[in-house]
Design a protein with these regions (language model features):
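Histidine-centered, transition-metal-coordinating active-site segments
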Residues: 1-87, 99-412, 418
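Short alpha-helix carrying the canonical HExxH Zn2+-binding catalytic motif
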Residues: 86-94
Length: 418
C-alpha cells in the first residue's frame, strides 16, 4: 500500500489523448523541463511514417509521458513500495532520452560509426553525465525526495545479465513492458489504424508476479495478451514496415551515409562520423553535439551545399520519393525458387547490397544515390518462446504463453477446401 499521499503523485496533471489526465510528481516535472527531455518534442516516434499516415507526427515526448503512466499502473497493480514506484516511473519517463533523429532509424547510423552504440547506451550515458538530471534523480536540494539515481540507472542499463530487481527491469523492458503497451496503442491511434488496439485495461488488471517474483499475466488475462501480441505483429507488417515508409527511411539513410565522411560539413573539418563517435571525442563534446541533433537539425545539416545529400533530403521534404522497382520475397514460397539464391540474397551484408546498388546504377545509367538495395525483415514473430509468462493461481504454476496459447503460430491451421 502506498505511503505517500495522492497529491504527491499529482503535483501536476497533463491531459493525454489515450489516458486522460496523467499525474506527475514535482521531480518528474523537473525532469520534463530539462533540455534533454524537451528535445524529444523534435523527434518523431515513427520516423517517416507520416508520409504514409499523415496523422503519425507524434513524438517521443508524448510516448515517454504515456510510458510513465503505464509503468505506474503496473507498479500499483504489482504492489510496489513508494521507492520502487518512483524508480519505475522515472525510468519509464527517461527511457528514450538517447533516441536520435527519426528515432530507431538513427540506430542504423550508429552501426556504421560505433557498433557498440545505440539509443539505449546513449540514454545511460546522458543520465550519467548530465549534472541537472543526475541532481534531480538524487533528490538534491529537496528533503522530501529520496535518491533514486542508482536504481534508475541500473534498470536502464541495456542487456544487463543480472539486475538487483529484475521485476522493475521487466516493467521497463520485457515481453510485456510499459513501453510496448503504450506505443502500440499510441502509434495505432495517430496512424488512424485499428491494428494496435487491444484491451489494455484487462492486461493491466491481470498483471502479477509469480512466487519467484517474475512478471506474469494471470491465466484469465491470457486472451487480452494474445490480442496484444497479434496487434504488435500486425503493426509491424502494416505500419512499421510499410513499403513507402521503408523507401523514405532508406533515402534518409543514404543521405546520411553520403555525408558521414564529408570534411566540409563543419567549419572545424571534423566529419559527422567522428562527431557521432563517443570514444573519438570527450564525452562532454559528444553529448553537446548530440543534444542539438533532432529531426529538423539533421535535415538542415544534410542540406549543406557542400553535401551530396542535399537533393535527396529536399526530395524527402517534398515527398518526391523513389519508387519500388523490384520486390523479391525470400521466403520458401516466394519468387526466388533456388534455395542457394535465396540464402545468398538473405545473407547479403550491407556492403554487398551497396555494391549491388552501384552495379545496377551503372547498368541503368542513373546516379548511384538513387538506386538503393535494402533487405526488409519483420523483426518479431507472432509468438516467441520465453517472452511472456502466464501464472495459474489455482495450480500455482507458471508457464510460457508460447506453449499454452491457442493462437500461437505453431497451432495455426488453414481450413481444407472440399
Amino acid at each position: 500500500m502506498s505511503g505517500r499521499p495522492n497529491h504527491y503523485w499529482r503535483y501536476k496533471i497533463i491531459r493525454d489523448p489515450l489516458y486522460g489526465f496523467i499525474g506527475l510528481t514535482r521531480r518528474e516535472v523537473k525532469l520534463m523541463n530539462t533540455e534533454w527531455f524537451t528535445r524529444l518534442f523534435r523527434i518523431k516516434q515513427l520516423s517517416h511514417a507520416f508520409l504514409v499516415y499523415p496523422g503519425a507526427v507524434h513524438t517521443r515526448y508524448e510516448h515517454s509521458l504515456g510510458t510513465l503512466y503505464v509503468a505506474d499502473r503496473m507498479a500499483v497493480q504489482l504492489g510496489l513500495n513508494d521507492h520502487e514506484r518512483e524508480v519505475v516511473r522515472a525510468a519509464a519517463l527517461l527511457h528514450d532520452l538517447g533516441q536520435g533523429p527519426f528515432s530507431h532509424l538513427f540506430d542504423e547510423v550508429f552501426k556504421w560509426v560505433d557498433k557498440e552504440c545505440d539509443h539505449e547506451h546513449l540514454t545511460k550515458l546522458i543520465i550519467e553525465n548530465d549534472e541537472t538530471i543526475r541532481s534531480i534523480l538524487k533528490g538534491e536540494n529537496n528533503n522530501e525526495e529520496n535518491d533514486i539515481y542508482s536504481d534508475v540507472l541500473e534498470i536502464l542499463t541495456p542487456r544487463k545479465r543480472f539486475y538487483k530487481n529484475k521485476l522493475l527491469a521487466d516493467i521497463i523492458s520485457g515481453g510485456l513492458d510499459c513501453d510496448k503497451l503504450d506505443y502500440l496503442r499510441r502509434d495505432s491511434y495517430h496512424a488512424g489504424v485499428a491494428y494496435g488496439i487491444f484491451d489494455i485495461e484487462r492486461v493491466l488488471n491481470t498483471i502479477t508476479k509469480d512466487p519467484r517474483g517474475r512478471l506474469c499475466i494471470l491465466k484469465k488475462g491470457k486472451d487480452a495478451v494474445e490480442n496484444y501480441r497479434l496487434g504488435r505483429y500486425l503493426m509491424h507488417i502494416q505500419v512499421y514496415r510499410h513499403h513507402t515508409r521503408e523507401i523514405a527511411d532508406s533515402m534518409f539513410l543514404r543521405a546520411v551515409k553520403l555525408s558521414l565522411y564529408n570534411e566540409k560539413l563543419f567549419e572545424d573539418g571534423i566529419t559527422l562520423a567522428e562527431k557521432l563517435t563517443p570514444n573519438k571525442n570527450s564525452i562532454k563534446d559528444f553529448l553537446s553535439f548530440y543534444k542539438q541533433l533532432d529531426d529538423y537539425s539533421i535535415y538542415s545539416l544534410l542540406k549543406n551545399p557542400a553535401s551530396r545529400s542535399k537533393e535527396l533530403v529536399e526530395n524527402l521534404e517534398r515527398r518526391k520519393l523513389l519508387k519500388r522497382a523490384v520486390d523479391l520475397d525470400l521466403t520458401s514460397g516466394g519468387e526466388v525458387r533456388d534455395a542457394i539464391d535465396r540464402l545468398t540474397l538473405a545473407n547479403m551484408t550491407e556492403e554487398e547490397m551497396d555494391g549491388l546498388s552501384e552495379k545496377i546504377a551503372k547498368r541503368i545509367q542513373e546516379p548511384s544515390e538513387y538506386v538503393i538495395v535494402r533487405r526488409v525483415e519483420i523483426p518479431i514473430k507472432l509468438f516467441k518462446e520465453g517472452e511472456i509468462l502466464v501464472y495459474d493461481e489455482d495450480q500455482n504454476l507458471t508457464d510460457d504463453l508460447y506453449r499454452i496459447s491457442t493462437v500461437s503460430y505453431t497451432h495455426l491451421t488453414l481450413p481444407t477446401t472440399e
